[in-house]
């Protein structure tokens, strides 16, 4: 009888603990905050614009009006879903289609985004593609590139880091072509 009573008390204590802690843990996991960033929004725009110029020199941009309109339409819907506290009205979200067969997409600071043809072809539905695009848009909205640089060093290093990202994307594109 004593064991049953102790077992019940432990069960009640465990349940009380779970009832109190689980909601707190859930909130902590779903609460998104803007990372620390010493750079101005204009820095993101400048870096992204410079990187976009390089991307468009090195990647084959696909001139398919229907496919481009499609990713622009999906992208525009995703951008309107960005929570107000993370919206930067000066960001220019632009969506271009890269003629590469690998399943990939990437976004640059300030809004330029590139979706590979292979991702559209591999997606079983619009939701799969939109999920990848939303992930990339979140990097832009939360200003991850300059926030990461705030942790690591100078703006010049940031431009170098974007060069490395683009180099990796080029290699991935060659591997998937």
Model-derived segments and spans:
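Bacterial N-terminal signal peptides
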Residues: 13-23
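A Zn2+-metalloprotease active-site environment signal
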Residues: 14, 26-177
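N-terminal secretory signal peptides that target proteins for export/translocation
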Residues: 1-8
């Amino acid at each position: 009888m004593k064991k049953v009573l102790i077992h019940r008390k432990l069960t009640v204590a465990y349940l009380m603990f779970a009832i109190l802690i689980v909601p707190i843990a859930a909130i902590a996991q779903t609460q998104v905050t803007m990372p620390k960033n010493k750079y101005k929004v204009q820095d993101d725009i400048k870096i992204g614009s410079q990187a976009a110029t390089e991307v468009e020199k090195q990647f084959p941009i696909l001139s398919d009006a229907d496919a481009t309109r499609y990713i622009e339409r999906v992208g525009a819907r995703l951008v309107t879903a960005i929570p107000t506290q993370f919206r930067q009205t000066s960001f220019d979200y632009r969506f271009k289609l890269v003629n590469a067969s690998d399943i990939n997409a990437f976004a640059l600071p300030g809004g330029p985004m590139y979706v590979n043809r292979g991702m559209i072809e591999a997606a079983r539905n619009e939701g799969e593609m939109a999920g990848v695009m939303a992930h990339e848009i979140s990097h832009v909205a939360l200003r991850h590139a300059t926030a990461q640089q705030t942790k690591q060093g100078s703006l010049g290093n940031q431009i170098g880091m974007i060069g490395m990202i683009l180099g990796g994307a080029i290699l991935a594109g060659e591997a998937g072509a």
